Curated annotation (Swiss-Prot):
Catalytic activity of the protein: alpha-D-glucosamine 6-phosphate + H2O = beta-D-fructose 6-phosphate + NH4(+)
Active site, UniProt feature: D67, N136, H138, E143
Alphabetized NCBIfam families for the sequence: nagB, PRK00443.1-4
Gene name per UniProt: nagB
Keywords for the protein's UniProt record, in alphabetical order: Carbohydrate metabolism, Hydrolase
EC annotation from Swiss-Prot or TrEMBL: 3.5.99.6
GO molecular function: glucosamine-6-phosphate deaminase activity; identical protein binding
Gene Ontology BP terms: carbohydrate metabolic process; glucosamine catabolic process; N-acetylglucosamine catabolic process; N-acetylneuraminate catabolic process
Pathway: Amino-sugar metabolism; N-acetylneuraminate degradation; D-fructose 6-phosphate from N-acetylneuraminate: step 5/5
Primary role: Catalyzes the reversible isomerization-deamination of glucosamine 6-phosphate (GlcN6P) to form fructose 6-phosphate (Fru6P) and ammonium ion.
A Pfam family recorded for this sequence: Glucosamine_iso
Protein name: Glucosamine-6-phosphate deaminase
Annotated organism of origin: Clostridium botulinum (strain Eklund 17B / Type B)
């Protein structure tokens, strides 16, 4: 595990984007695992800037997103399809046929989950998976008490997660109650994982993830066992960590 602490959110976003750029420079047909939520938005902006400055080429890249709400049309501005278009895909040269996001509108949702894992496998596996982390240390929509071996599956969202996401909707009632998410088992198969966190409200989750007992009660704690994990934090998210355990960048 490698832990980097940045001065602020902008520096964190820049560092994360540089790591993605390095991955694509080394392997032009990289398979990227992407996340939604507020944390990676700055990274996506930096990647768009890099593309506009001809520093990065996405034409051979494939992307797989972590999750999508169930029964929320992709045209809805709160769907993760919409989010990814609005924050990244509409502004870079990634091919539409190389973008994969779970289909939350699928008639056979269980089959959609199996199909999604198979698509990742057929692509050769994810080279680098971007993750955010919830206040309760969830990753993707893998909530506390999750089975660590689970592949992509349908999850009932915890009330705390719905409340956290309600800020993106007009009301709590509009937040979908279910989502398709890559399971911990699917995420863990990624060759490299990059976990991003900002703000004091994430400090406890980060502390438990790095120092705590590995337990389904803290879903992100399983990342302690991953062979190639990089954690990028701002000062606030790192506030509970021992300074000897991280590098300031």
């Amino acid at each position: 595990m490698k832990i980097l602490v940045c001065e602020n959110y902008d520096k964190l976003s820049e560092k994360a984007a540089q790591i993605i750029m390095s991955q694509i420079t080394l392997k032009s047909n990289s398979i990227l695992g992407l996340a939604t939520g507020s944390t990676p938005i700055g990274m996506y902006k930096k990647l768009v800037e890099m593309y506009e400055n001809k520093m990065i080429d996405f034409s051979d890249v494939k992307t797989f997103n972590l999750d999508e709400y169930q029964n929320l049309p992709i045209s809805n501005d709160q769907s993760y399809h919409y989010f990814m278009d609005d924050n990244l895909f509409n502004y870079i040269n990634v091919k539409r046929e190389n973008i994969y996001i779970p289909n939350g509108m699928a008639n056979d949702i269980e089959n959609e989950c199996i199909k999604y894992d198979n698509l990742i496998k057929e692509a050769g596996g994810i080279d680098i998976q971007v993750l955010g982390i919830g206040n309760n240390a969830h990753i993707g929509f893998n909530e506390p008490t999750v089975n660590f071996e689970k592949k992509t599956y349908v999850v009932e969202l915890e009330e705390s997660t719905k409340i956290a996401n309600a800020r993106f909707f007009n009301s709590l009632d509009e937040v979908p109650s279910k989502a398709i998410t890559m399971g911990i088992g699917s995420i863990f198969e990624s060759k490299k994982i990059m976990l991003l966190a900002t703000g004091e409200n994430k400090a406890k989750a980060i502390y438990d993830t790095i120092y705590g007992k590995v337990t389904p009660e803290v879903p992100a704690s399983i990342l302690q066992f991953h062979d190639d994990l990089i954690v990028i934090l701002d000062k606030e998210a790192a506030s509970l960590l021992n300074p000897k355990d991280y590098k300031v960048v």
